[in-house]
Each structure stands twice: as C-alpha cells, then as structure tokens.
Amino acid sequence: MAVAQCPASCGELIQGWIMGSEKLVSCPVDWYSTVEVSTGSPLADERPLSRAMVNQLLAHWDYPAHLSQDIRVSIHSTIPIAKGMASSTADIAATAVATAHHLGHELNETTLAQLCVSLEPTDSTVFQQLTLFDHNDASTQIPCHSQPALDLLVLESPQTLRTADYHRIPRQAGLQAGAPALKRAWEKVQEACAQQNPYRMGEAATLSAIASQMLLPKPDFDALLSLVEECDLYGVNVAHSGSVVGLMLDRQRHDVEYVKWLLTRKKLTEHWPEQHLLRMVSGGVQPQ
C-alpha cells in the first residue's frame, strides 16, 4: 500500500490578473487529505476525479488501461467541499503521488501540476513553496523561497460554489479592473517572503480580497476589514472562487478568543458560523 497527503488551502493569498492571465498563490494550511492506494477492486463510492487521475498515470507510464480495475483508492479527508479550501486538489494530487509510489514511480512537482490541471483548475498547494501559479494550464510556476510564519482563523460559511461554476461567471472586465491592485499584491507577497514579514503578507492578501469583491463579493466585508483594523491583525484573505475567509494573525500575539467574540458581536457569525484556527504550512504532497 502507498499513502500520500496534501494540505488544504484557506482560499488564496492572492488571485487575479497578473502578467497577462489569471493566476493565484494558494494559502496551504494544516488540514490534510490522506489517500491510500492499494491492490484491490475500486470502491463503490470513490471520487470520479481520483479515478481519472489513476487512469491518466497509467497512460503517462504506458501501462495497460485495464490495470485500473486492480487499483483501489481510499480517501480520508474532512476538508470542507466546494467552499474554496482546495479539497479537490488535495484529493487528486495525493491520489497521484500515492498511485505513482504504488506503481514504483516518482512524480516531480511540475509533472504533478500538469496532470492535475488537465483534469480541473488546480490550487498551488501542490507545490512545497508558495507559488504563483496559472491554475488553468500550469504555464506559470514562480516559487517564493521562504514564507513568513502565520496562523489563520478560517471562517467557514454554509455557502458552496463549485470551482467549475465560478469559472462560468463572466469576469473578464472585473479581472482587468483589478490588475493594478494584483500587480502590487504580488510584489508584496514576494517582499513578505523575502523579509519573513507576516504584515506584508497580510497587506498583499487584503489587496487581493478587496479586488475580489468586484467578482465574488463576501457579505459584510467592510465589517471584516474594520475587525482586522481594530485587532491589529495581519490582514484578511478570501477564497476567490469559494466562500471561506481567513483572518491572518499570530495565535501567540493576538487574542483569538477576543476576535471570536467580536465576530459574534458584529453578527459576522451569521455568515460564517464555524471557525477553525489553523497554521499556514508548506505545501506539497508528502508520501507517508
């Protein structure tokens, strides 16, 4: 049996029109999809995209297609689905690496990214480093070589939106309008990583979140911004094609219980009734 795990993402640190196309930098957090691949018949309730990934890998290495019927994929994940937390990328990327190991192969990050985008738009959680990524065709992969330490209070909404449905929304005009802000946001991400500066990362994410309001507005967004200001948090990041929001902070320095109390007082918990305190971590799929 081969096992691999891939982290979820709290939305994106930034996403928008950068250098001529829509690109993103995911925000990997310590919540994982773990996938076991073993010899056996496929499970009845398996996820179609994971099976599609198995079939792609068999073709990639010139195995006969019928071998798929002897490969069992078991996914263990509590990552919320269709909320902007990269649950699908985590499942299919971990499936890819576990299947590769099961077949006796290694997968580098670039090949993994290309395999994933051929199935669906993909989050940059597949890379160990924070990476500016063209999530539609994998043509751009620009890594940041370090990242600041920070925590996220992830605000989970009951609202769901499939990534494919988001991509059907006409958004070209909004993307173009946000391009100057996204240029600045990407510069700030690079500075934040070079300087290990969480405040600079918060500025980058907040710029992108504000630009995203033109495309997929979050409710009571101004109240979220005022809470960030009031508590001197690093910033706010959002799922640009989902409903989650992240309050960027340091659990040692900021009073998380007070932040939660304020969320209730400002009635923001009506939109985001569940909260999860998570760490931003390195991305990448790890064999277990």
Q: Where are the regions that the model predicts?
A:
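ATP-binding N-lobe of GHMP and related small-molecule kinases
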Residues: 1-83
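Solvent-exposed alpha-helices and their adjacent loops that cap or buttress functional pockets
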Residues: 4-6, 16-18, 26-29, 124-126, ...
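Active-site catalytic microenvironments for nucleophilic, acid-base chemistry
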Residues: 56, 60, 98-105, 118
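A short, flexible beta-alpha/helix-coil linker loop
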Residues: 79-81, 208, 243
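ATP-dependent small-molecule kinase catalytic core of the GHMP/sugar-kinase superfamily
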Residues: 108-234, 250-264, 268-288
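Small/polar glycine-rich anion-binding or flexible loop at a beta-alpha turn
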Residues: 239-246
